[in-house]
């Protein structure tokens, strides 16, 4: 689950980090009042969406008066912001953040952390190249990114943070401020179950103060039951409508841009299914994992989700029966095809628990389903069914 910038800053501030002060505004009048309330000569109005690249997309503007703040807010709120991280429709802007002007600054740094699944540790990343896309830095100048793996048994140690500060070229009071920032960020990461966080840029002001000018936090959705207050911050308007609907039925769904709908049980098998569709010249329209314990109701909802996509011209169902029985899946497929009125070709590959019984149920159904003997055969048939 993602947080908005203003929510991320509030959370980080509660852990002792110095952040760029700001006020969230849900309409132009509130934006104008926020400018006056901040009391500076300048302010920055930022669209609050769950996507990066806001500045290049026109979602971040410097304003010099309350009237300008009102006008910028009016141009953003109620519209969709399209960035390089969104789809063509963009993300809806329901609010803007009006933040204090912290510039000029002497330096812009980058600080982030992620759960590194290969090392099974929280890994911090820091760089002198703040204020730009860190992905570009990683690609073009990987040597400029410092990495620190945190031993989960002892946590982040002050000496590790100091070492990073030295390598970033900080000095004097800046070092202590940075250590406090990094230790506070780690404490927030662990206590709030972050999956990822970024401060980009982490600015060094002319007076030596270190301030979080931006904040991005992604929470581990599997741990949200432990954090009802954080769960209350969820903004469903920023989530893909289909993916949101899928999560309500315990389906893992990600929309793609192809025309072959996929229904698979198991994330690994789903990835392999998409790969082999590509290998045979097709393009998957989605990633859809119905789970190891798929029920008849879940399969029906999965069909509805797939067919909600107008680009889908064929469907490949790939089920490996383990916990789930193939005969139950076959019955669910038949019921779903009848209920949803499927008009596109449907290729079905069943293997494992009661696969033969499931295949017979499908064959006796009278429906125009295309059976497949293996994964390669299924991919070949679904691609050829497109004509």
Curated annotation (Swiss-Prot):
One Gene Ontology cellular component annotation held by this UniProt entry: succinate-CoA ligase complex
Residues annotated to bind ATP: 46, 53-55, 100, 103, 108
Biological process per Gene Ontology, one example term: succinyl-CoA metabolic process
Keyword Membrane: no
Record field: catalytic activity: succinate + ATP + CoA = succinyl-CoA + ADP + phosphate; GTP + succinate + CoA = succinyl-CoA + GDP + phosphate
Binding, Mg(2+): 200, 214
Domain ATP-grasp: 9-245
Keywords, sorted A to Z: ATP-binding, Ligase, Magnesium, Metal-binding, Nucleotide-binding, Tricarboxylic acid cycle
A GO term, aspect molecular function: ATP binding
Similarity comment text for this entry: Belongs to the succinate/malate CoA ligase beta subunit family.
PANTHER family: SUCCINATE--COA LIGASE [GDP-FORMING] SUBUNIT BETA, MITOCHONDRIAL (PTHR11815:SF10), SUCCINYL-COA SYNTHETASE BETA CHAIN (PTHR11815)
Cited function: Succinyl-CoA synthetase functions in the citric acid cycle (TCA), coupling the hydrolysis of succinyl-CoA to the synthesis of either ATP or GTP and thus represents the only step of substrate-level phosphorylation in the TCA. The beta subunit provides nucleotide specificity of the enzyme and binds the substrate succinate, while the binding sites for coenzyme A and phosphate are found in the alpha subunit.
Name of the protein: Succinate--CoA ligase [ADP-forming] subunit beta
Source organism of the structure: Francisella tularensis subsp. tularensis (strain SCHU S4 / Schu 4)
Gene: sucC
């Amino acid at each position: 689950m993602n947080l908005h910038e203003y929510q991320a800053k509030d959370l980080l501030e509660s852990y002792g980090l110095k952040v760029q002060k700001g006020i969230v505004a849900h309409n132009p009048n509130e934006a104008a009042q926020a400018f006056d309330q901040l009391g500076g000569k300048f302010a920055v109005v930022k669209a609050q969406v769950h996507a990066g690249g806001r500045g290049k997309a026109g979602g971040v503007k410097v304003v010099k008066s309350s009237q300008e703040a009102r006008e910028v807010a009016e141009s953003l709120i109620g519209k969709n912001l399209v960035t390089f991280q969104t789809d063509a429709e963009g993300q809806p802007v329901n609010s803007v953040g009006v933040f204090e002007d912290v510039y000029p600054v002497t330096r812009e740094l980058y600080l982030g952390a992620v759960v590194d699944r290969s090392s099974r540790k929280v890994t911090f990343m820091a760089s002198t190249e703040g204020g730009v896309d860190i992905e570009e830095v990683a690609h073009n100048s990987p040597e400029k990114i410092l990495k620190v793996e945190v031993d989960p048994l002892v946590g982040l140690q002050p000496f590790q943070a100091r070492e990073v500060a030295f390598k970033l070229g900080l000095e004097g009071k800046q070092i202590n401020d940075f250590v406090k920032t990094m230790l506070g960020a780690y404490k927030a990461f662990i206590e709030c179950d972050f999956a990822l966080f970024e401060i980009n840029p982490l600015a060094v002001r002319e007076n030596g103060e270190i301030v979080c000018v931006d904040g991005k936090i992604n929470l581990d959705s599997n741990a949200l039951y432990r954090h009802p207050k954080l769960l209350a911050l969820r903004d469903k308007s920023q989530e893909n409508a289909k993916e949101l609907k899928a999560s309500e039925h315990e389906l893992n769904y990600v929309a793609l841009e192809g025309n072959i709908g996929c229904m698979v049980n198991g994330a690994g098998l789903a990835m392999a299914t998409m790969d082999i569709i590509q290998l045979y010249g097709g393009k998957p329209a989605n990633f859809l994992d119905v789970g190891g314990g798929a029920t008849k109701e879940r399969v029906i909802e999965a069909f509805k989700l797939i067919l909600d996509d107008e680009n889908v011209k064929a469907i490949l169902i790939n089920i490996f029966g383990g916990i789930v029985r193939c005969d139950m899946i076959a019955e669910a497929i038949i019921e779903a095809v009848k209920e949803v009125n499927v008009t596109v070709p449907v290729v079905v590959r069943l293997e494992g628990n009661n696969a033969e019984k499931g295949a017979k149920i499908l064959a006796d159904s009278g429906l125009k389903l295309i059976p497949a003997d293996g994964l390669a055969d299924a991919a070949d048939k679904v691609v050829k069914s497109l004509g």
